[in-house]
């Protein structure tokens, strides 16, 4: 498999309603794909399957090289493997600053002890500033995230995902 992600024959049903039927596709590295459709078409269900939130009735989801099944992995293990997901409603820490939100999202060791003992260094601050500039929030790093507009919170969440350096970003 040369694809970053390969979905093959995936079907999902909820109480008899078929949300996905025999979905198959692949995504290569550095490839952009758009999934469009009306409400109820299965777009969110597809993302739920890839990120481990929903287990399919049948089919397979392979990730990386060598290919590994994502179906046996937890949501957190899938995220650590490099799959990032942006939800419809932004989820940011509203009592923390933009800078703090981005700093907490940096790709670092995630054990409880590592998180408690984390002390940002110069490269961490530089990466946060770079991310803030990319998402258009460089001028508001010191503002509390709860003070941002809805659109700015959306961008902040995208920045938080980018901080984790995902190999695949589902938006």
Features from the language model and the residues they span:
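Conserved ABC transporter NBD signature motif
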Residues: 59-68, 81
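Conserved structural motif at the start of ABC-family nucleotide-binding domains
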Residues: 5-7, 20, 27
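Catalytic Walker B motif of ABC-type/P-loop ATPase nucleotide-binding domains
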Residues: 169-171
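Conserved ABC ATPase "signature" region
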Residues: 115-140
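The feature captures the beta-strand-to-loop junction immediately N-terminal to the Walker
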Residues: 36-38
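Helix-to-loop junction immediately C-terminal to a conserved catalytic motif
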Residues: 51
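Conserved ABC ATPase signature
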Residues: 144-148
